[in-house]
């Protein structure tokens, strides 16, 4: 089954916890703190594998979770960083954040990688908190939570040439005779339910990748029929091969077919009309084809080459394939509009979120929430009094106490943070 669009949940690994420990060795009085830091959690990485051409990996597994970093150990030994979770994807994969619509990655080259969510930093051990005033701190940090996202993964096949046309004009037959691909062929509409790829080798030892897409019908760009689901795959083809049933076997006018398909491409993306086109006048072995071709050329206003072929009898295919190969030699391979090399770091300004927000529940409890305050809470080890006191100081420094008083909080009021409750004390 061909899968080219799927929603996925990804969660990077949390950082390992720091450790509270002390040196206890003979002849080492006042050994001091010796708790190590936790290891970093694993990143979730998408990596291009050119052997794949579908998102089948995601069909039955739509939740990916990275491993947690190792906890810190005694004798100031740091925990081990977790290995990244590497997920193979086909070339042409685009990753989009479902909540913001931001394009996270556009993967087009073999072995290209992108970090989709970043693993959490390991928590610091008590060695890191030693100061002259507190040489033996009884506190450590929990690991930072790993990032998590709901993402949409889309595949836009990277083929040199894309076959377009109405259903049953002979696209699949053409692909089957010029390549080793074996698409399903039958005498009814929408026999092709998903894209098929084939490698074409010309007689002069040139080659290119040809994509057969489900047939388009009028209104495809608005979601009518099946072809609209796969219009995105045309975006990365370098040449559009427009296959037309020149015999008009279903009673349609070939020139009207040509205009309607181009209109659908234009409605989907106007830039597609700038893509080089070659017209394959198919079924020339059938009655009325020659007369229709003469009429077609008389009405054709565009300066587009027309090649007479019969996919069934294989007539005219040599000249058509040579023309496609010649055209491809003049067109650069697909590149992203905004090319970012591995050496380039793009900094985007992002407005800093407020560290916390306060709302009030119907029962009168005050609710604290916000990315920063929730992160501090999760990284606090509440089993040690010094860590609790540090968390209280952090809240005071952020202005949480003052903000609660301004909201009307009084002694004994309940304050909620995540699934925990606290008592407000003036």
UniProtKB/Swiss-Prot annotation:
Pfam families: DUF1967, GTP1_OBG, MMR_HSR1. Transmembrane segments: none annotated. GO terms for molecular function: GTP binding; GTPase activity; magnesium ion binding. It is found in: Cytoplasm. Residues 66-86, 119-146 are annotated as: Disordered. It comes from Oceanobacillus iheyensis (strain DSM 14371 / CIP 107618 / JCM 11309 / KCTC 3954 / HTE831). Belongs to the TRAFAC class OBG-HflX-like GTPase superfamily. OBG GTPase family. Mg(2+) binds at residues 172, 192. Residues 348-426 form the OCT domain. One of its GO terms (cellular component) is cytoplasm. Its EC number is 3.6.5.-. Its cofactor is Mg(2+). Monomer. Residues 159-329 form the OBG-type G domain. One of its GO terms (biological process) is ribosome biogenesis. This is GTPase Obg. An essential GTPase which binds GTP, GDP and possibly (p)ppGpp with moderate affinity, with high nucleotide exchange rates and a fairly low GTP hydrolysis rate. Plays a role in control of the cell cycle, stress response, ribosome biogenesis and in those bacteria that undergo differentiation, in morphogenesis control. GTP binds at residues 165-172, 190-194, 212-215, 282-285, 310-312. It comes from the Bacteria. Keywords: Cytoplasm, GTP-binding, Hydrolase, Magnesium, Metal-binding, Nucleotide-binding. Its main location: cytoplasm. The keyword Metal-binding applies. Residues 1-158 form the Obg domain. SUPFAM superfamilies: Obg GTP-binding protein C-terminal domain, Obg GTP-binding protein N-terminal domain, P-loop containing nucleoside triphosphate hydrolases.
């Amino acid at each position: 089954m061909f899968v080219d669009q799927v929603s996925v949940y990804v969660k990077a690994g949390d950082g390992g916890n720091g450790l509270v420990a002390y040196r206890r060795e003979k002849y080492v009085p006042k050994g001091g703190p010796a708790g190590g830091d936790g290891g970093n959690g694993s990143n979730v990485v998408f990596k291009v594998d050119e052997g794949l051409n579908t998102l089948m990996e995601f069909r039955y597994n739509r939740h990916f979770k990275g491993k947690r970093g190792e906890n810190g150990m005694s004798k100031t030994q740091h925990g081990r960083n977790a290995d990244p979770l590497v997920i193979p994807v086909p070339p042409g994969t685009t990753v989009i954040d479902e909540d913001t619509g931001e394009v996270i990655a556009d993967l087009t080259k073999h072995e290209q990688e992108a970090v989709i969510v970043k693993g959490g930093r390991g928590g610091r051990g008590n060695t890191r908190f030693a100061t002259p005033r507190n040489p033996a701190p009884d506190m450590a940090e929990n690991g930072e939570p790993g990032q998590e996202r709901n993402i949409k993964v889309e595949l836009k096949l990277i083929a040199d040439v894309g076959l377009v046309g109405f259903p049953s004009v002979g696209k699949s037959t053409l692909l089957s005779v010029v390549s080793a691909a074996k698409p399903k062929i039958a005498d009814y509409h929408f026999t092709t339910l998903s894209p098929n790829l084939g490698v074409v080798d010309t007689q002069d030892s040139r080659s290119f990748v040809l994509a057969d897409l489900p047939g388009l019908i009028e209104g495809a760009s608005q979601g009518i029929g099946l072809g609209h689901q796969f219009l995105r795959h045309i975006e990365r083809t370098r040449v559009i091969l427009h296959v037309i049933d020149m015999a008009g076997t279903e009673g349609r006018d070939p020139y009207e077919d040509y205009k309607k398909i181009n209109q659908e491409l234009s409605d989907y993306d106007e830039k597609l009309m700038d893509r080089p086109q070659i017209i394959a006048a198919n079924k020339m072995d059938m009655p009325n084809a020659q007369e229709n071709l003469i009429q077609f050329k008389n009405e054709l206003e565009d300066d587009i080459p027309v090649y007479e072929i019969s996919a069934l009898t294989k007539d005219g295919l040599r000249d058509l394939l040579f023309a496609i190969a010649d055209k491809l030699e003049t067109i650069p391979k697909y590149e992203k509009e905004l090319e970012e090399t591995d050496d380039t770091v793009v900094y985007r300004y992002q407005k800093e979120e407020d560290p916390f927000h306060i709302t009030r529940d119907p029962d009168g409890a005050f609710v604290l929430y916000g990315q920063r305050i929730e992160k501090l809470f999760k990284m606090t080890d509440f089993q040690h009094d010094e860590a609790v006191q540090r968390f209280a100081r952090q809240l005071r420094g952020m202005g949480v106490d003052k903000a609660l008083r301004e909201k009307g909080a009084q002694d004994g009021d309940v304050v909620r943070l995540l699934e925990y409750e606290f008592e407000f004390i003036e």
